[in-house]
Amino acid sequence: MNCHYFKNQTSNRPLYFNSRRVPFNEAQTLIKKILPDAGFTSAYETISKWPGYQPTSLINLDNVADALGVKSVFYKNEAERFGLKSFKALGGAYAVHKCLEMLIGKNHVSDHKSPKIKKMIAGITVTSATDGNHGKSVAWGAKMFGCKCVIFIHEKVSKNREYALKKYGAQVVRAGKNYDESVKIAQEKAKENDWHVISDTSYAGYSTIPKHVMNGYEVMIYGAVIKQRVRPTHVFLQTGVGSLAAGVTASLFRNLDYSPRIILVDPENADCWVQSIKHQEPVACEGSLENLSLIHI
């Protein structure tokens, strides 16, 4: 990916502008090849029927908008979603649902509370590596449908995040010095034990489940932005491993009739996206978890 580098005039943080940004219609076509409309439709129809589902708040920050001299600034509040206090509540849980559909059939998953299907699902184990948020969604989804869940976290993940995962019934295993190592260990253990990996990170030969994760994130933005007819000009997203940013971007381009500007925020000491853009190939970074890609308003 080619990019132009610019020095930020208000801070020491660099800005990178993607010089390969394609026209809106072409972007829509590319997105729909990777994430077809049917995947989003299925995700919305499924998630919107879950107990307690409702669109989460889009908060209008009038004071911030006035200070910046712009018309409006909105903050997407996902903390209230299903009581998880997580901005990634939808992706992992929906991927668990799709995984179970692939294993036992769609009709059986819909009937997951019947004794016969309960017993069938109870013999299935899903697993994932996480820094906290994705794993919480996977654990919550596993608990909702009744399957077992094993979550791998690396040595730097906080105790509070570990306890939050256990709250939803997951077996939590500390393994690896960083997230990438935890991902590899989760893959290995899944192969050894016939578990099913629910990852928001794709790799060679593994892309179907991450696409379901992204479809889940599409529902998040659809409910609060598209259905409420909010028309953003600029959208700021944390990068993480990329699935949330990709899912939100896909939902915007799928449902809007114009192209908003998408701004990705990378943590300074774990800037894998910035480095990957600079080197035009995927780059692994081993940064401190003290540096998170948060957007401060």
Whereabouts are the PLM-identified features?
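PLP-dependent amino-acid enzyme catalytic core
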Residues: 1-295
